[in-house]
């Protein structure tokens, strides 16, 4: 984790640029995050927080942090920017309740293809989720943001949790 911090400290300009990016999503992350975490995917329009989340064929979300005001109506669009079909490189968005174990959830859901990789035994840990989409597809869901706090979101497609979570 600390390996990503020394590089920006060696160069003045990137450090200042990074600082500007960190100010955009108001509260700071408790742990260092990859550069893509700086991508602001939330746009508040009136009473609705619009979230534009992207996933690709490299098993990456375009961010690993989403900040929305507690209780705000959320309209989240997951867009698969890759080309591979859902059967081989499908992605979904699953927002788990506070305290839920993302790894355990993903492991339990690996065989739940018919329910978009959300197993019946762990469905009660989900706040909101999308269906699985393939390359070039997108899906939009609406839900109310939970109480203030930190929540795990992930792609539960088999093998994706390790690199597709935030």
Show the residue positions of the predicted features.
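Bacterial lipoprotein signal-peptidase II cleavage site
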Residues: 1-11, 21
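N-terminal low-complexity, Pro/Thr/Ser-rich intrinsically disordered segments
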Residues: 17-54
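Extracellular/periplasmic metallocenter environments
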Residues: 32-35, 128-166
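N-terminal edge beta-strand
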Residues: 43-74
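Asparagine-centered strand-capping/turn motif at beta-strand->loop junctions
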Residues: 78-80
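Extended, low-complexity, turn-rich repeat/linker tracts enriched in Gly/Pro/Ser/Thr and Asp/Glu
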Residues: 82-86
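Short edge-strand/loop segments of extracellular domains
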Residues: 93-103, 161
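Extracytoplasmic beta-sandwich strand-turn segments characteristic of Greek-key/jelly-roll folds
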Residues: 100-147
């Amino acid at each position: 984790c600390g390996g990503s911090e020394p590089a920006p400290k060696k160069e003045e300009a990137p450090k200042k640029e990074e600082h500007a990016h960190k100010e955009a999503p108001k509260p700071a992350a408790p742990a260092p995050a990859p550069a893509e975490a700086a991508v602001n995917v939330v746009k508040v329009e009136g009473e609705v927080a619009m979230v534009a989340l992207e996933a690709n064929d490299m098993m990456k979300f375009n961010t690993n942090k989403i900040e929305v005001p507690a209780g705000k109506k959320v309209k989240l669009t997951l867009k698969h920017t890759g080309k591979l079909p859902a059967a081989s490189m499908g992605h979904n968005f699953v927002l788990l309740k506070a305290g839920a174990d993302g790894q355990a959830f993903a492991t339990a859901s690996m065989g739940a293809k018919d329910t978009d990789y959300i197993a019946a035994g762990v469905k009660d840990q989900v706040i909101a989720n999308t269906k699985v989409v393939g390359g070039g597809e997108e899906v939009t869901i609406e839900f109310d943001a939970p109480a203030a706090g930190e929540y795990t979101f992930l792609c539960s497609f088999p093998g994706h949790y390790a690199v597709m979570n935030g």
